[in-house]
Amino acid sequence: MTEFEKTYQNYNPRQAALDEARALLTAAAKAAMADGALPEAELPAFIVEIPADVKNGDIASNIAMAGARSWRKAPRMIADALLAHLPAMENSVFAKVEVAGPGFINLFLSQSFWASVVLGACANREYGRTDHGKGAKYNVEFVSANPTGPMHMGNARGGALGDCLAAVLDWSGYDVTREFYINDAGNQIQKFGKSLAVRYLQKYCGEETFPLPAECYQGGDIKVLAGEFADINGDKYVAACSGLSEEALFESEAFAQLKDALVAYALPKNIAALKRDLSKYRIDYDVWFHESTLHESGAVMAVVDKLLELGACYKAEDGAIMYRSAQYAAKYGTVNKKKTEDGTEEEAKDEVLVRANGIPTYFAADIAYHYNKLATRGFAKAIDVWGADHHGHVARMKGAMDAIGLHGEDLDVVLMQMVNLMRDGQPVRMSKRTGNAITLTDLLEEVPIDSARFLFNMHDAGSGIDFDLDQAVKTDNDNPVYYVQYAHARICSILKKMESEGVQFAGAEKVDATLLTEPSEMDLIRMLAAFPQEIVMAAEKYDPSRINRFVIDLASAFHRFYGNCRIQGADPAVQQARLALCIGVKNAIFNVLTMFKINVPEKM
C-alpha cells in the first residue's frame, strides 16, 4: 500500500465534513463570546446535518436558532455574529458559508473536498470500511432455529438479515462474532423424541395402535427420520413398548430409552442439515453454542443461585424457584401475558425459573445464555435477531440482565416481521416438489442465492416482506441484485474498452478530480461521499437494508452519469478524472456485494 493509499484508510468524508462544520461553528461561537459580539453563555446543543436540497448548502446548522434563548438575540443576528467570527478557512474543506432565512447557516464544500472523495474511493479498495466501532466486541445471534425440523422462510429472512447486520458492524470497525444457539435441551427435545418414538412404533404396529398425540410434531420429516432409524435398528424396541396404555407407555422406562436412542440418532442429523443449508446460504458462524452445555456445566443453576442471592428470586411453597419478572421488566415495556382460568389475559408477574421437580425452565437457560455472552465472554453488546412473535420476551430478557447485575441496555433485540412468498401475484405456501410447507432447502433449489440474500435484505426488519419468486429468478433490471451487478459489470467493460483503445488509467494520485463539475458527476460524487457513513448508520440502527437501497441508488446514479458524460473521446485530463470516478463507484459496489456475500461479475 502506497503512502497515498494509506491517506484514505478508514476514510469517511461525510462524517469528516460534519465534524469540521461543528468544530468551525463551535470555534466561531467561542470567539464571538470572547469578543463581546455575543453574551457569555453555555454553548447550546445544535444540529449539523445534510440538507435535502443542495441549494441550501452541503451542510446546514440550526445553531443560531438553538442559541436564541441563551444569547438573547434574534437568530439572524446570532448567525451574522458567528459568520464574522469564523476561523480562517484557507485549509478548510468549506468554500463558503452563508446565512439563510431566519438564521440557518449553510456551509458549501469546496471542489477540492469533492475531488478528495473521488480519489479516496478510487485509491482505497476497501472504501466504506471505517474504525468507527473501535474494535468493540459485538455478538450477533441469528436464525437459531430449533433442530427439531427444517428451516422455514422466517429463518431465510433472519439468516440474510443477521449475516448482513454482522457484515455492516464488521465494516464499521466492530469485532463481530456470528453465533447460532442450538436448542438441544428442554421441552422441545423431549417433544422431538416423543414424536420420533411414536412414528417408529407406528411403522411396526400401525397408527391405530400408537396414535400420534396432537402436541407432537406432525411433519413428514419426523416419519422419515423414524423410518431411517427403524431400517438400521429393526424392531428391537417394539416388544417392550407393546401392550401398555398410552399413559403407561409414555411414563415407561422402555419408551424413555427409545426416545433417547432416536434423539441420539436424529438430532445430529438435523443439526448437520442445518449447518449444510446455512453454509449453502453463505452463512458461516464463528460459534455454534449448545444449550445443553449450560445445563451440563452447571451454568444454569449458578445463574439461578446468583438471582436468589440478589433477591430477584424466591422459593415458592411447592419448592419452585420464582423470578420477580415484572419488577425488572417494567422499564423495558410489556412482558409476556398469561391466561387466567376464565380465559382472559393478565400480565405475568412472577415466573418459574426452576420447577418444583427441580428441572429448570427454558427461561432460566436463556438467562444463563445471555449472562454467558455479556459476563463470561465479555461482549459489549449481545444482539439477537428474533421473529416479531417473540416481542413479549424482550422486556423480560433485558430486565433479567439488570436483575443479575448486568445492563439490560447491552442486550439489543432486532424484531423481524413475517415473510410472504408470492408467485404470479398470489401467496405460495406449499412446495411443488414436496407438497409440504416451503423450507429453506426448497427455496435455495429454486432461487439463486444472490437473489435470496439481496431480496430478503431489501426492507428493514420491522416491515413485512412479500418475496416475489418470479422477480428473484429474473436476469434483467426488474431484479434489484441483477441491476446492481450489471452496473459493476458495465464499469469493468468500460475500463477494458478504454485499455483496448490504449487509454491507461494513470493512478488516483495523478488525477485532477476537481475537473468533475457536471451535475450528474456531482450527484455521483455526493453519493460516494455518503457511502462510509451509510454503513456506519446501518450498523448503528441495526438496519443493513439501507445499504441495499443505497447501492441501488448508486447504480442508478452511475447509469445517469454514463449517459450524460462522455469518457471515450473526452479531454485527456477529464477522461482520467472520469475513469477515477468509475473506479470509485466500482469499488463501492464491489464492497457492498462482497460484504453481503453476493457474487460480483465482471461481465454479464
Regions found by a protein language model. Give the residues of each.
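Short, charged, solvent-exposed linker or helix-capping segments at domain edges/interfaces
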Residues: 116-121
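Non-catalytic interaction-recognition regions
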Residues: 2-115, 129-604
